Amino acid sequence: MAKKSMIEREKKRKKLVEKYAEKRRELKEQFMKAEDLEQKIELHRQIQRLPRNSAPSRVRNRCWLTGRPRGFYRDFGLSRNVIREMAHEGLLPGVVKSSW
C-alpha cells in the first residue's frame, strides 16, 4: 500500500488540474493563434505562472484500492496485483484466466 501522503498529494494534483484546465486550454489556444512574437512570449509567461501541479502531465495514475503507482491498468483503474486477486475471486465480471 502506498503512503497516504502520496495518495493525498495525487488527489490534490487532480483537483488543481481540474481547476485550471479551462484557463490552460484557453491560453494554449491563444498561443497557437498568436502571430506576433511578443504576444507569444507573454502568453507563454502566463502559462508558466500557473501552478506547476496544474499540468496534467504531473498526475500519476494510481490504483484506487491500494494507491500503487506502477503496474496500473487503465481499463480497471487497478494495479496488476489487485486485478489478479479480484479475478481469482471472481469479482471482475467478464475476466477469465487465459488458457491455450
Curated annotation (Swiss-Prot):
Belongs to the universal ribosomal protein uS14 family. HAMAP family: Ribosomal_uS14_1 (MF_00537). Binds 16S rRNA, required for the assembly of 30S particles and may also be responsible for determining the conformation of the 16S rRNA at the A site. InterPro entries: Ribosomal_uS14, Ribosomal_uS14_bac/plastid, Ribosomal_uS14_CS. Keywords: Ribonucleoprotein, Ribosomal protein, RNA-binding, rRNA-binding. GO terms for cellular component: cytoplasm; small ribosomal subunit. It comes from the Bacteria. One of its GO terms (molecular function) is structural constituent of ribosome. One of its GO terms (biological process) is translation. This is Small ribosomal subunit protein uS14.
